């Protein structure tokens, strides 16, 4: 197992896979792709057709401010809608005692785009020129617009949270962290 080494080339030599990385070459009989947000690219290096592509979606969180933690004493999740690929915002109690609310789901402009300002032009180009993303947007136009609105407006994000906790107010939440979801999308 080799971690923290970006694979730049893969090839099969006999019954072994050779992975070339900045840390050197590594050989093994089996290849397990654990490249997360880059797994489609690593699969391409291994000779697989890129029929499915990873499109990065940033999930932004808010957290309850200190004086509002009593509003949520347990995990609170919405009933999933099987027609949509994302669960929707929810409340999660954290092990250290805090409570986070979220996430939304918006296109990240970089595969490691944890902030709204993170932009990687090749990653962004890869996403916006992919027909699978546009098929997704056409299938879920309302949800796409609402998720973007929630990203741009704390008030709109709070309104989504009020479906689960009606008494929550904009002043009860403050910006939290973010994650990036590796959303696998088919071309068609």
Show where each model-derived region lies.
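Flavin-dependent oxidoreductases
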Residues: 10-120
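Generic structural signal for well-ordered, non-membrane alpha-helical segments
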Residues: 35, 84, 126, 150-158
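Flavin (FAD/FMN) cofactor-binding core of flavoprotein oxidoreductases
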Residues: 53-59, 63, 67, 135-188
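Extended, charge-rich helix/loop segments that form flexible
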Residues: 110-144
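Short, well-ordered beta-to-alpha junction loops that form the rim of enzyme active sites
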Residues: 5, 104, 176-178
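A conserved beta-strand/loop element that lines the FAD pocket in flavoprotein oxidoreductases
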Residues: 1-7
């Amino acid at each position: 197992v080799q971690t923290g080494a970006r694979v730049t080339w893969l090839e099969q030599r006999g019954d072994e896979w050779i992975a070339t990385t900045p840390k050197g070459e590594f050989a093994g009989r089996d290849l397990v792709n654990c490249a997360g947000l880059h797994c489609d690219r690593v699969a391409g290096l291994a000779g697989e057709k890129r029929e499915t592509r990873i499109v990065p979606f940033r999930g932004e969180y808010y957290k309850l401010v200190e004086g509002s933690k009593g509003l949520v004493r347990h995990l609170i999740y919405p009933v999933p809608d099987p027609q949509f690929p994302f669960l929707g915002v929810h409340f999660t109690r954290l092990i250290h005692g805090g409570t986070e609310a979220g996430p939304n789901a918006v296109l990240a402009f970089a595969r490691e785009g944890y902030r709204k300002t993170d932009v990687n032009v090749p990653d962004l180009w890869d996403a916006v020129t992919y027909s699978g993303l546009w098929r997704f947007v056409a299938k879920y136009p309302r949800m796409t617009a609402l998720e973007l609105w929630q990203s741009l407006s704390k008030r709109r994000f709070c309104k989504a949270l009020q479906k689960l906790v009606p008494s929550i107010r904009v002043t009860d939440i403050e910006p939290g962290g973010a994650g990036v979801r590796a959303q696998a999308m088919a071309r068609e």
